């Protein structure tokens, strides 16, 4: 996939802000202990999670980056945010090549027994290989109450989503203009065995493809709290669409 690197990703910035607002609203007073992410060179997701109090300086970071050339800048960005070498493990590999055993070793190195927050921010499609990876990580590495966030391409390789096209009862997913939002939400609910709450379809200006972001799981199921989070989420629907 070819991201347009000459343009600022203003829509993604709004989506990232809304994502961590939602996680904060549905997990009040909780600071996550171990954050699995794909922060790239700017670590925007780590910065926003820290700003909103979803994580703090005691949180352990497991960062994944497949491009060896980006590692130096990634580590510098994490260090500037307060996550030095003793607070992080950086894994350089393709996402689906990383086994649960490798992630458990990273947890052990950091002094935690599991991962309780994931942001699988990919530029990939939700093909079966990625589905299996998510299933494996949730089953073997994540804590029982973990929050799993996934950001995937919504309109390229869709053959492995065909069986999920039956309409499901997903919060706000019917308001997404991208027709693959509901199947993706359905698929991720099955992969994670967690309710899909936050579902947003968006698209950056330029050549970038449409994306769908989903959050699975939350600690609070109180109707009033969810209603507030849903109202906030509505404001992020269809960003970047005409």
Annotate each predicted stretch with a short phrase.
Residues 103-117:
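A short acidic, Gly/Pro-enriched loop at the edge of an enzyme's catalytic core
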């Amino acid at each position: 996939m070819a991201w347009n690197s000459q343009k600022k990703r203003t829509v993604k910035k709004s989506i990232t802000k809304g994502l961590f607002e939602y996680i904060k609203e549905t997990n009040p007073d909780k600071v996550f202990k171990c954050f699995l992410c794909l922060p790239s060179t700017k670590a925007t997701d780590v910065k926003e999670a820290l700003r909103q109090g979803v994580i703090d300086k005691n949180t352990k970071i497991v960062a994944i980056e497949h491009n060896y050339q980006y590692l130096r800048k990634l580590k510098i960005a994490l260090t500037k945010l307060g996550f030095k070498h003793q607070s992080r493990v950086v894994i350089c590999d393709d996402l689906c090549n990383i086994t649960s055993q490798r992630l458990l070793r990273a947890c052990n190195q950091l002094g935690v027994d599991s991962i309780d927050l994931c942001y699988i921010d990919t530029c990939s499609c939700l093909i079966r290989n990625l589905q299996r990876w998510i299933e494996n990580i949730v089953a073997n590495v994540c804590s029982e109450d973990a929050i799993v966030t996934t950001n995937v391409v919504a309109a390229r390789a869709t053959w492995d989503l065909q069986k999920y096209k039956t309409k499901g009862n997903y919060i706000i997913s019917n308001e997404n203009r991208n027709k693959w939002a509901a199947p993706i939400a359905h698929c991720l609910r099955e992969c994670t065995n967690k309710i899909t709450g936050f579902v947003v379809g968006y698209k950056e200006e330029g050549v970038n493809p449409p994306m769908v972001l989903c959050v699975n799981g939350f600690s609070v199921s109180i109707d009033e709290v969810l209603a507030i989070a849903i109202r906030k989420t509505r404001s992020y629907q269809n960003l970047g669409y005409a």
